[in-house]
């Protein structure tokens, strides 16, 4: 309903006519309820939940100043996601004021790469070793989009996390992706997971990026590096999880992306937390066989020693150690013999194909923050207990 999705509105009228009053009354009636605001707009909720505010002034609609005034209002907001139950509104950020760093380097393949880094102000130059979350954006978006709409920076400020958002490359759209077959000259910002000939270039990029971060930022805690992403960024997380580069991550966790590509070089146990949406682009149902979603789940169950090729289907359908519902999250957890969770899957009720800030908070609170890596032995620990 109109009360369920926060919509910032600025109405400019020369006089308060009956018609103008009717418009203002409409938006007053649609004033955002507190629960909706908390769900969709974690930042600035009190502003969005406030009653409609009106002001009187003299405006010349032909003046550039009026256009600038309207743009100044609209341009401060950012919305991601189109579903009523799963989109978030946030504020555009001032990167310079926040202290975000934009970095570039040429990787070992000769490809120019870009990424952004955010270190909370309280930790800059402190010398304190910080956990690092590397977040891969989705198809046709960018590191800036993903930085702004995930609100990971709020979690970073609260928990003392270094954030890294890599940028993908502008490449021809493959036939498997919408628009590619109809328009072979189209280019979009994509990870290369859909191109068998080029996909490994992004594995090399991931390796080289880790080397760059360690060389440039002494504060990187190599035992607490985590990988996340959304949509195609989740596909990247799966792909990197199947490769040897995964040995450098303490844990992985990502949202709304199935298995698109895999290697067979990853051998260490790497805990993974995967979410899908009830109204996602791919089925969330683990009882369906051989879907792109269940292919991802099966890969992780086998990879982490929770099943083998002969029984993974049964293990996926009935082998979870624990299943439970918490809020919108329908959880299934697979634990090893020591009771340590190595794979967690959750489908989110009422969610579309979008990354919610609440999901990222969950990934940090209940997954990443619980897991560390001994870089000398390759052994991970969950809440201090070694993962055998």
Roles of regions detected by a PLM:
Residues 123-176, 249, 261-262, 282-284:
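Short substrate-entry loop that stabilizes the transition state in hydrolases
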